[in-house]
Amino acid sequence: MNNLIMLVTNAVTLSEAAGGLFDFNATLPLQALQFILLTVLLTFIFYKPIGKLLEERETFISNNLAEASAKLLKADELCEQYETQLKEAKTGAQDVIAKAESEAKGIVAQEITQARADAASLIAQTNKELEAQKKLALQQLETQIDELSQLIKEKLLGKVVL
């Protein structure tokens, strides 16, 4: 290792002495070796860990996106199911309401029919009572007329007439 450092320092001093930017002497292969060594070191120390991190992050993001899209699909399915159930519930409720309305109309019609029948029987009974009272009143009037005519006869004739 010390030999390598000495070679590098010697090469640097030689290149300074020559004064050229690219001297094609021993420094060029040394610089190429340094570049390759730097590239290998950076690859293992820097690029591979960062590449792993980027790959892990990309995997994490893609997994989260896949999971989110799966959950979104499931949510859409649940939403469709709930909408279907809601439509069925509304239809069922409308059926129940229609049935209740028809039952209520039937009950009202039955009550009206019953009330009319009760009213008709009450009218018939009242008519019978009125007829009975009329007959009674006529009988009482006839009795009173007979009594009055008897009184008139007695007053006119002066005695009791049978």
UniProtKB/Swiss-Prot annotation:
* Signal sequence coordinates: none
Compartments, record wording: Plastid, Chloroplast thylakoid membrane
Keywords in UniProt for this one?
ATP synthesis, CF(0), Chloroplast, Hydrogen ion transport, Ion transport, Membrane, Plastid, Thylakoid, Transmembrane, Transmembrane helix, Transport
Q: Which InterPro entries does this one have?
A: ATP_synth_b, ATP_synth_B-like_membr_sf, ATP_synth_b/b'su_bac/chlpt, ATP_synth_F0_bsu_bac, ATP_synthase_B_chain
Gene Ontology CC, one term: chloroplast thylakoid membrane
Q: Which GO terms describe its molecular function?
A: proton-transporting ATP synthase activity, rotational mechanism; proton-transporting ATPase activity, rotational mechanism
Q: Which residues cross the membrane?
A: 26-46
Topological type in the membrane: Single-pass membrane protein
**Cited Pfam families:** ATP-synt_B (PF00430)
Gene3D superfamilies per the UniProt record, alphabetical:
F1F0 ATP synthase subunit B, membrane domain
Stated family: Belongs to the ATPase B chain family.
Its biological purpose is as follows: F(1)F(0) ATP synthase produces ATP from ADP in the presence of a proton or sodium gradient. F-type ATPases consist of two structural domains, F(1) containing the extramembraneous catalytic core and F(0) containing the membrane proton channel, linked together by a central stalk and a peripheral stalk. During catalysis, ATP synthesis in the catalytic domain of F(1) is coupled via a rotary mechanism of the central stalk subunits to proton translocation.
User: Assembly and partners?
Assistant: F-type ATPases have 2 components, F(1) - the catalytic core - and F(0) - the membrane proton channel. F(1) has five subunits: alpha(3), beta(3), gamma(1), delta(1), epsilon(1). F(0) has four main subunits: a(1), b(1), b'(1) and c(10-14). The alpha and beta chains form an alternating ring which encloses part of the gamma chain. F(1) is attached to F(0) by a central stalk formed by the gamma and epsilon chains, while a peripheral stalk is formed by the delta, b and b' chains.
Anything else of interest in the record?
A: In plastids the F-type ATPase is also known as CF(1)CF(0).
Q: What is this protein called?
A: ATP synthase subunit b', chloroplastic
The organism's lineage is: Eukaryota, Haptista, Haptophyta, Prymnesiophyceae, Isochrysidales
